[in-house]
């Protein structure tokens, strides 16, 4: 129902991956939105071998494959699960530099594009530590349509350095995790939670959340009573960058969906607010200070 609600609220871009639920994420899109195929844009990802029957060790990363035969096979399987004959955006999932440097991969993607099975291709970079080289190489050396990155008020590096390169090379950036693991939604304002075992946040030490909430306290000036919530401010922050063409928030209920989609109707981040955010970022959000300190503007 939420996916149908999303379309009703004006959302037409849906991002998934073959590895989400071992294909279940793609199947859900087909089941719920298949009848609206011509009205929506579907992006999915490839690169992890979800077809290997070897049991996984906890949250250990799956083996990746980007050879010609695997990519073609993965594409066919995604098309089948999505119930469609074309994918709007096909993204190499968490691809490493060595695979980015292989021409065969991009020749394969161009062939899939020529055959009409995909319309555009790009990369989904991450996680947020250790993909500077991948991002810079992609944006300057490969003719991709898009690059998906993690970018938010709280997590700006290394995506911040990609913004100029994306604009110069006419690559659209897709920003995921705009609410920084929900620290910018108000979910944790009443105290530290206990995460379910299958929640990726449960595998971090509590210190990350304690520090994050100190940072959130420093940016509460963004909230405008009755006109812009913190969650909406977080979306406006991301969309202030012209090279970011879409933001990909997670939502789990209708209230969140309506709040996020209405973010575009709220006041944009002003230049003064942006200057304050830039200074806070430069100084680590002044988490050691009792109150945020700003230079005169």
What are these regions (language model features)?
Residues 1-44:
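N-terminal binding-site loop/beta-alpha segment at the start of enzyme catalytic domains
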Residues 96-280, 284-286, 294-297:
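Beta/alpha (TIM)-barrel catalytic core signal, keyed to glycine-rich beta->alpha loops juxtaposed to Asp/Glu
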Residues 1-6, 66-82, 128-137:
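Short, acidic/polar
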Residues 8, 31-41, 79-83, 107-113, ...:
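Acidic (Asp/Glu)-rich catalytic clusters
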């Amino acid at each position: 129902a939420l996916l149908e609600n999303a379309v009703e609220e004006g959302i037409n871009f849906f991002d998934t991956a073959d590895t989400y639920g071992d294909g279940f994420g793609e199947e859900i899109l087909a089941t719920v939105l298949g009848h609206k195929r011509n009205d929506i844009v579907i992006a999915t990802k490839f690169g992890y071998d979800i077809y290997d029957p070897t049991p996984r060790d906890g949250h250990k990363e799956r083996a990746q494959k980007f050879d010609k035969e695997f990519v073609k096979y993965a594409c066919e399987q995604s098309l089948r699960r999505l119930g469609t004959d074309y994918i709007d955006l096909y993204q190499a999932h968490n691809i490493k530099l060595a695979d980015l440097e292989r021409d065969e991969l991009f020749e394969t993607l161009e062939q899939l594009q020529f055959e009409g099975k995909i319309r555009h291709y790009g990369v989904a970079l991450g996680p947020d530590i250790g993909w500077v080289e991948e991002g810079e190489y992609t944006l300057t050396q490969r003719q991709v349509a898009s690059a998906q990155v993690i970018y938010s008020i709280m997590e700006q590096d290394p995506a911040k350095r990609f913004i100029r390169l994306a604009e110069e090379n006419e690559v659209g950036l897709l920003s995921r995790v705009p609410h920084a693991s929900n620290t910018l939604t108000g979910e944790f304002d009443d105290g530290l939670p206990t995460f379910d075992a299958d929640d990726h946040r449960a595998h971090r030490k509590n210190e990350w959340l304690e520090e994050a909430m100190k940072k959130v306290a420093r940016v509460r000036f963004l909230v405008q009573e009755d006109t812009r919530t913190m969650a909406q401010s977080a979306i406006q922050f991301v969309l202030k960058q012209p090279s970011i063409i879409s933001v990909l928030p997670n939502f789990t209920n209708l209230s969140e969906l309506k709040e996020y989609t209405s973010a575009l109707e709220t006041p944009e981040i002003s230049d003064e607010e942006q200057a304050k955010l830039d200074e806070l970022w430069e100084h680590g959000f002044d988490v050691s200070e009792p109150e945020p300190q700003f230079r005169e503007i």
